[in-house]
Amino acid sequence: MDMSSMAGSIGVSVAVLRFLLCFVATIPVSFACRIVPSRLGKHLYAAASGAFLSYLSFGFSSNLHFLVPMTIGYASMAIYRPKCGIITFFLGFAYLIGCHVFYMSGDAWKEGGIDSTGALMVLTLKVISCSMNYNDGMLKEEGLREAQKKNRLIQMPSLIEYFGYCLCCGSHFAGPVYEMKDYLEWTEGKGIWDTTEKRKKPSPYGATIRAILQAAICMALYLYLVPQYPLTRFTEPVYQEWGFLRKFSYQYMAGFTARWKYYFIWSISEASIIISGLGFSGWTDDASPKPKWDRAKNVDILGVELAKSAVQIPLVWNIQVSTWLRHYVYERLVQNGKKAGFFQLLATQTVSAVWHGLYPGYMMFFVQSALMIAGSRVIYRWQQAISPKMAMLRNIMVFINFLYTVLVLNYSAVGFMVLSLHETLTAYGSVYYIGTIIPVGLILLSYVVPAKPSRPKPRKEE
């Protein structure tokens, strides 16, 4: 069976099928990295295998595109360390935005196409974090946050270490994003990967098989659901004839269906990182310790679908990118001695939107996300203000927050899926902008009905 027939049998284009085959191939390629003997050999293998898979997936030009942010990051570290992080951030994002605009990648993805822009998105985050951590390496530890202390780089990585980190076995295809310091310790057998001090080497095979089985289930469910809930339905006359509840139910199912594609992709990338050994994140504290593989984890499916609060969504969806946004945007916008507020949240969501592309649907989704999280916090504060003795009322507030999250998340997700301004507004307007009005209403209401703690704070002795 040729590529065209194979692609047709599963309903994708030849380009997407080629990418999927190379993407799945990252699992055996990453496994082979385990048997590469030396530290230098691991760096060379990681860089070469990543570049080769990129060539097979997207063509020769993809590696030329990848060289641009990689060069920006390395040159900024070599030339001007005091500002290398901010230089890489703005120049790296500028190039990524240029590629988004030139290739109109969102339209290609929406129509079943593929290009290297998605991999460039992951690579951009990796080079920025590396530069920022190298910048942090020259700062005093006392003024740094815990994440900065943990990930700071005292010495500049060599060029081959840098290339291996950026392209490691195709991990730039869909993530997860990881830190340069972790990559170096993994290749050198240091830190949690040190097996010289009577530490046993964790076996990755059970966790890898679980991730592969999860990927298979996710893909099967996605292929079953996607013909039943096409995104084109939002602009069809039949959709406008439906009642409010049916329209809203369709929005929920369209968002639910789309998420399984991402669950599949992240499960494959998780399997790839786990089997290489890089996904190892330490041992549990049980009497009989078990290995943890959280470094590779990018999604908690049940955590997303059953989230009790919108605040939990960034902790369980695209986990490593959410962590990156928290460490390199959100926390760095907070001045010392002050608390983060809505500005930091909105700025972080804006960066996330720009990272995805300059489509109106992305912008509206991430602004909606900021409103959704802020509204969910209001409900939570009201819940916490209820006396513990009123357990039933507290549980009702928890359930209300769950329903609120389901409603606003799937309403907001339409913009992320359809991308265009007209289609997004048509879908939002068809349900009377309920997913926008409710969060804004909650935020405004919080000023009228502020939450008071259920127990007054004890007065300090004078």
Curated annotation (Swiss-Prot):
InterPro entries named among the record's database cross-references: LPLAT_7/PORCN-like (IPR049941), MBOAT_fam (IPR004299)
EC number: 2.3.1.-, 2.3.1.23, 2.3.1.n7, 2.3.1.n6
Catalytic activity: a 1-acyl-sn-glycero-3-phosphocholine + an acyl-CoA = a 1,2-diacyl-sn-glycero-3-phosphocholine + CoA; 1-(9Z-octadecenoyl)-sn-glycero-3-phosphocholine + (9Z)-octadecenoyl-CoA = 1,2-di-(9Z-octadecenoyl)-sn-glycero-3-phosphocholine + CoA; 1-(9Z-octadecenoyl)-sn-glycero-3-phosphocholine + (9Z,12Z)-octadecadienoyl-CoA = 1-(9Z)-octadecenoyl-2-(9Z,12Z)-octadecadienoyl-sn-glycero-3-phosphocholine + CoA; (9Z,12Z,15Z)-octadecatrienoyl-CoA + 1-(9Z-octadecenoyl)-sn-glycero-3-phosphocholine = 1-(9Z-octadecaenoyl)-2-(9Z,12Z,15Z-octadecatrienoyl)-sn-glycero-3-phosphocholine + CoA
Domain of life: Eukaryota
Membrane topology: Multi-pass membrane protein
Disruption phenotype: No visible phenotype under normal growth conditions, but the double mutants lpcat1 and lpcat2-2 show increased contents of very-long-chain fatty acids and decreased polyunsaturated fatty acids in seed triacylglycerols.
Keyword Cell inner membrane: no
Keyword Transcription regulation among record annotations: no
Cell compartment(s), UniProt: Endoplasmic reticulum membrane
Pfam family, one: MBOAT
GO-annotated biological processes: galactolipid biosynthetic process; glycerolipid biosynthetic process; phospholipid biosynthetic process; triglyceride biosynthetic process
UniProt keywords, alphabetically: Acyltransferase, Endoplasmic reticulum, Lipid biosynthesis, Lipid metabolism, Membrane, Phospholipid biosynthesis, Phospholipid metabolism, Transferase, Transmembrane, Transmembrane helix
Catalytic-site annotation from UniProt: 356
GO cellular component, one term: extracellular region
GO molecular function: 1-acylglycerophosphocholine O-acyltransferase activity; 1-acylglycerophosphoethanolamine O-acyltransferase activity; 1-acylglycerophosphoserine O-acyltransferase activity; acyltransferase activity; lysophospholipid acyltransferase activity
Protein family (similarity comment): Belongs to the membrane-bound acyltransferase family.
Function, in words: Lysophospholipid acyltransferase with broad specificity. Mediates the conversion of lysophosphatidylethanolamine (1-acyl-sn-glycero-3-phosphoethanolamine or LPE) into phosphatidylethanolamine (1,2-diacyl-sn-glycero-3-phosphoethanolamine or PE) (LPEAT activity). Catalyzes the acylation of lysophosphatidylserine (1-acyl-2-hydroxy-sn-glycero-3-phospho-L-serine or LPS) into phosphatidylserine (1,2-diacyl-sn-glycero-3-phospho-L-serine or PS) (LPSAT activity).
Stated name of the protein: Lysophospholipid acyltransferase 1
Organism: Arabidopsis thaliana
